[in-house]
Each structure stands twice: as C-alpha cells, then as structure tokens.
Amino acid sequence: MKQDSRFPNLFILDHPLIQHKLTHMRDKDTSTRTFRELLREITLLMGYEITRNLPITTKRVETPLVEIDAPVIAGKKLAIVPVLRAGVGMSDGLLELIPSARVGHIGVYRANDHRPVEYLVRLPDLEDRIFILCDPMVATGYSAAHAIDVLKRRGVPGERLMFLALVAAPEGVQVFQDAHPDVKLYVASLDSHLDDHAYIVPGLGDAGDRLFGTKN
C-alpha cells in the first residue's frame, strides 16, 4: 500500500495480484464475463487490504482441548454500500470476504454537467456500524463525495466510512479530499487525468457498460 503526497487520504493498493488483474480489466478486448469475474476477484483482494485495521475484541471459545479468549471483530456487522450501478459488481467480492455484512444501496447518475443526481437510498441501521462504499471509478469525484454526504447527513462520522474504487483521476481525488478529508479513499490505481468527456485516462472505459454488457 502506498500514498501520494498530494492526497493525504488516498491509499493505493499496489499488491501484485491486484495490479495484474487490473491490467486485464483495462484491456478493451476483455469479455463481459471475464471483466465481471475479475471485478469480483480484485474487489475481494482489495477488501482484504482495507479491513486489516478493523477493531478487534476477544471472545471466550472452547477448542477441543481448552477454553481461550480468541480475537473477533468488534462492534456491529460491517455494511457494504455500492453506488449504483457499477458498484454492484464490487459488492459480490466484498460479500465473499465478509458474508455476514449488511448491504445498502445508493443510486446516483451523472447529469450533463457531471454533477450527481440521487435517485435511490436504501441503508441498514447506521448506529455504530462501519461502512464500505464502493464504485469502480472516481472520475470527477462528485458521485463519490455525494455518496459519503448521504451517510454523513444521517449522522455517520467520517472515521466509520471508507470508499473503495479501482481507478481514480487526480481531479476526482481532489474533489473527494476537499469534501471529505476525514474519509479514506482506497484505489488500485491513480491514473493520469480526465479527458474532455470526463473519462479517466488511461482508465478502463465505462465500468457499468463493461460489467453488464450494455452500450453507452
């Protein structure tokens, strides 16, 4: 895991397996089926990395030989909140890693001015719960920042929120950081820039279209 000095709350997951799978996802000739499988696999690997600092407590258990105080994750079940629609493809990998997690959804689409328009919010109970929000792309950063706003407006503090994405543009990371300096943003790659259509370069195309086999 590495950081970029420009963005204190950005963490780049540079594990070789994550980078290998991301390269195959970038390939324009990768099929929808393979893209979907790779998204699940890479999200599972990234989920392992971002959960390494979850709070721990102990529980009394009886092994076949003795009783011991053994470590377990403290607090309530985690919640996974994909940002629709492409974020849904990431929730499968996280649920494979954390099958007991609760799942919410935030529906946001990008208007012509690239600003987010919210159309759906469904969340589990919020008190004392850690939330992992996910969306493959942080391009302009407005949708990611808006999704965090949704939870903060409902009283969830930044220290109980984290955002997981595959690739991000510096412009979007700056927007996210300015809006939420207290929320950690985890990505597999910080790419070069946004083009004139607000697509990430080099990026991987439209993640939703590639995931679901649709045309923009």
Swiss-Prot record:
Function noted in UniProt: Catalyzes the conversion of uracil and 5-phospho-alpha-D-ribose 1-diphosphate (PRPP) to UMP and diphosphate.
Pathway: Pyrimidine metabolism; UMP biosynthesis via salvage pathway; UMP from uracil: step 1/1
Superkingdom of origin: Bacteria
Stored CDD domains: PRTases_typeI
A single BP term in Gene Ontology: UMP salvage
Reaction catalysis annotation: UMP + diphosphate = 5-phospho-alpha-D-ribose 1-diphosphate + uracil
Organism, as annotated: Burkholderia pseudomallei (strain 668)
UniProt-listed PANTHER family: ADENINE PHOSPHORIBOSYLTRANSFERASE, URACIL PHOSPHORIBOSYLTRANSFERASE, CHLOROPLASTIC
CC cofactor note: Binds 1 Mg(2+) ion per subunit. The magnesium is bound as Mg-PRPP.
Presence of the UniProt keyword Transcription regulation in the record: no
Pfam family, any one: UPRTase
Activity regulation: Allosterically activated by GTP.
Binding site for 5-phospho-alpha-D-ribose 1-diphosphate: 85, 110, 135-143, 206
Keywords: Allosteric enzyme, Glycosyltransferase, GTP-binding, Magnesium, Nucleotide-binding, Transferase
Keyword Transmembrane helix: no
Lineage: Bacteria, Pseudomonadati, Pseudomonadota, Betaproteobacteria, Burkholderiales
InterPro entries tied to this protein: PRibTrfase_dom, PRTase-like, Upp_B, UPRTase/APRTase, Ura_phspho_trans
Necessary cofactors: Mg(2+)
EC number: 2.4.2.9
Any GO MF annotation of the entry: uracil phosphoribosyltransferase activity
Protein name stated in the entry: Uracil phosphoribosyltransferase
Binding site for uracil: 200, 205-207
Family to which the UniProt record says this protein belongs: Belongs to the UPRTase family.
